[in-house]
Amino acid sequence: MSEKKGLVEKARRLGREYLRKYGGCAPGTLMAVADTLDLKVGDELFKAMAGFSSLSGLCGNLCGGIAAMGLRYGVGLEDFVKNPGSSSLSFAKLMRVTKALRQKFAEEYGGYLCDQVQTKLFGKCVMPTSPDELEAFGKMDPEKIRGFYEKCSSVTENAAGWTVAIILEMDEK
């Protein structure tokens, strides 16, 4: 197995595991990519990622992948303040890699919004955000709830693998 393929497989394995370990899709994807590529995730970024697992719009897995791409190619605040022009090359790379990741989501799930991904996985959007929906979700058969997390774990697995593959491809250029 090539080194690149090994890293992609590691990210996929960690993605499946980390959805539950880190309590959500966005931090799960971010941490799977970070642990695979030795990216440093600080407390503030990790804390912020929880908000992207809140069924608020974009798929949290996509957000976690984009955050990892930002860690890899972004410019830190201190460097940006010293030289605002330093972000031009970084921004161009980020546009290319995030577009590639969005495209993977669109191809696999028909879009990159949380409700589009859920509709592809479950045939409908499962949004336990209102009191009624949360109550109904809590009353679901435990096997169905396990199935829900299993399917969501597959998205985290894919997102982490795609993100690592796209980063490694960009690094080769």
Please identify what each model-predicted range represents.
Residues 1-18:
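Polybasic, low-complexity association/targeting segments
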Residues 16, 48-56, 89-90:
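Short secondary-structure capping micro-motifs at structural edges
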Residues 26, 31-33, 69, 84-173:
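Amphipathic alpha-helical interface segments
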